[in-house]
Each structure stands twice: as structure tokens, then as C-alpha cells.
Amino acid sequence: MNQNLTYNINLIGGRDWSKFKKWYIRLSLRKYLKLNENPVIISSNWELSEGLIPYRNKYKFCLVTVLHGLEVTRLQSKRYAKRTKRFVQSILNSDHVISVSNYTKNQAELISGYKQNKTIPNFVNTKKSFIVDKKKSRRKLGFKQSDKILLTLSRLVKRKGHETVINAISLIINKIPDIKYVIAGSGEEKYEGDLKQLVSKLKLDRHVLFLGYIEEDNKNDLYNACDIYIMNSNKTDEEGDSEGFGITFLESNACGKPVIGSNAGGISDAITNRENGLLIEPNNPTKTAQAIYELFNDEKLYNQLSENGITRIKENFAINKVGEKYMEIILNHYDY
């Protein structure tokens, strides 16, 4: 590959992408394709790629479709099954298909039969996720310095498994009386109500804190204020929603935090068991409690996972490392 090539990057935006994405992408790129020779289009969604199918025989361009998780796994549910044919056509009309995890890759191959799918993980933006002083972050957020804090930062939906962590805390509260579980994120009101009822039933009101929606600028302080990041996601729900990757595990690692996650969906791509965190069974409060207790009581293991996590981010998930993998595919496509 020629490492001295220069290139221009253009970001295509638009209004109300969720409803009209394939029409917006078609209108946005028509003029661009006319004026530029052999461009590379990296599409962040298969429905965007679908919008470019009519241009495949008219213009010469390299189409790279990136698959994340939900947009693939939900095709297995009754509600979204009708989209399967469109998905397959979108994949087959792409020059390259990249999945952010092996789990997403396998699901896409199962549905489409396309076997040239490659795996390149999401990157961690280390300008947004980085280590700062834990005491300062706790003071800023109003957390006690003595608390042992677990954090889940995610959409507030049942598949994320918050109730498993709450039940796990009830099993070890006598052994770790200063434990606090911080639930950050908004979502389904009914699910939030169910979680709060469970907290009251287990008499954990002083140990579980609901923060609601979190602004992007506050996320790094949350990661740094916690001791352990945890998310015990379920394998899938009735809508086909599953964890395609789990970027919050890696953002936590970048802040020096060990992580605990369930062996579900693409989480095993984000967590290597006993290297940067602990992988446990989903929906298992006992196993979850054991993992929490182990990390809070084994300082050597805690520090080892913390250090490994930081190193792993730098070596595998930094933006330059992930970018090199994309560039390799693009440059090889045109044989530069």
C-alpha cells in the first residue's frame, strides 16, 4: 500500500434520517458521484447502502457497508422479517461489508449467506474517554469518596439487565455495605418504574441511584467516578434487539476501570474474560454477585484488569488503529 496518498473526507448529513435515509443518501450523493472519480462511500447502515443500489451501474464507486447489531438481529423478529430481502440485496450490492463484532458478523452471514463479511471493532474516542482524578469526579457528581460504585450507562430498557445487577447487590449487601449502583440513562418509563419497585422491595433505596439522561460532557466523569462498570445484558428480546458490541465497556477501560459483562451478543468482542474484565452468564444474579465481590476484594486482580484494559484500548481500539484497518480495505480495493 502507498502510505503517502492524500484524500478528502466528506461527511454527509441530513434531516430525519430515521424515516427517509435511503432517499436522503441518494439525493445527497448524486451530484457528488457525478463530479468525483472512484470515491469510497462508507455507509453506517445497510438501509443507506440500499438507497445507492440504483447508482451501482451508473457510477463507479466503492461501497463499504458497516453493520452494528440491532439493525441486523431484529430481522429475526416477526416485526422486521419483511425487511430481510432488502437487507440481503443491500449486502450483495456492497463491495465490502464490515461488522463491528464477530457476533454481528455471524448473524449477518446467517441471514444473507454473504461470507466475505469482515470484523473491525468500533473505536474508542480517547479525547472523550480518558483518565481523570476519581476524587475530583466524585466531588463534581456529589458521590461519597468511601462508596464502592458500580455503574451502568445505557438505554433504560429491559434487555440491558439492570434488574440482574440489583438482585445481585441484594445478595452481597451485608458483605459490602457501602456498595452503590448508579444507573445512568433514560428509556422506557414502565421498565424504570419496575426497577424502582424492585429496589424498594429489596430495601435497596439507599444503594441504587437513578440519574436519568446523561449529557455527553458528563459521561467521562461518570466512568472515572465509578469503581467497576457493569452491564448484564440479555441475549435478545422479542424485537430481536441484542448487544451488537458494547462500546461502554471499552470507554470504561479507557478510564482505567475493570468491567463486568454478560456473555451475550457481541460483548465477548469487547471483554476478554479475566484480561480486561469478567464475563458472566446473563440473567444470573448469583454469578453476577460473585463477580462483583471478587473484584472488590481482590486488589491484585482489580489492578491487573485495569492496566490490561488501558493497554488493550491503545493497541486495538484507538481511532488510529481502527482507521488503519479501514484504510487497508479501501487501498487494497483500488490496488493503490
What is the predicted function of each stretch?
Residues 43-48, 67:
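Short His-centered aromatic/hydrophobic patch
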Residues 272-274, 278-285, 294-300:
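Conserved acidic donor-binding segment of nucleotide-sugar-dependent glycosyltransferases
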Residues 224-242, 257:
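Acidic donor-binding loop of glycosyltransferase active sites
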Residues 103, 123:
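Carbohydrate-associated surface elements
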Residues 130-143:
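A short helix/loop element that forms part of the nucleotide-sugar donor recognition site in Leloir-type
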Residues 249, 254, 258-261, 271:
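Short hydrophobic beta-strand element within catalytic cores of glycosyltransferases
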Residues 144-160, 166-169, 182:
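Conserved donor-binding/catalytic core segment of Leloir-type glycosyltransferases
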Residues 193-217:
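Nucleotide-activated donor-binding/catalytic signature segment of Leloir-type glycosyltransferases, i.e.
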